[in-house]
Amino acid sequence: MAVGKESELAGLEGPHTKVLDLEGLTVVPGFIDAHIHVLSSGIRHITSVDCTADTIRAIVSRLQARACQETSDQWIQGFMFDDTKTEEQRSLTRADLDAVSLFQPVIVSHRAGHVYYVNSRALEIVGFSDRTPDPSGGLLGRDPTDGSLNGVIYERAVEPIRKHLPLVTPEVRQEGLRLIDSMLTKAGLTSVHDAMVSND
């Protein structure tokens, strides 16, 4: 393989050489991502609502649309929320997600993957109340005025909630892997390291 200007490559080609004229486009090596959550990202693209909207109202609207498609006890899941990309420049709250549903549990993950947002029904299912101490390795967000839970869940405090989420079927895992593989390939990634896998 040789890359360069046409004048620099003159005379290098043989009878079986394939010549590509990229017409001024840039050639780069395949990218390597040494820390990515391949499987879980693929699964979320299949099971969760994309929360990359400009306003919290728009995000709530997307979640409401999903809630209307699900049964009354089905978890409504969202992902890719980023407070810094919204007009409001704030976190989602329990009140925001209660507007999605008071009967269906709702959970949304932050784009960074270390903060989660839930509604009152989700807190009730897990057994979190205003008197619940912070779980080991995490924090329960609270209203600074009265100490009540505001629906923001930090780090490992989400683990008790995860135990209540629906199981992911092998079919969804496979579909998610196929989807994320195509997305990574389209972005130019040729090698990745999944930073968290399970025995499943």
Model-predicted regions and their roles:
Residues M1-D200:
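Divalent metal-binding segments
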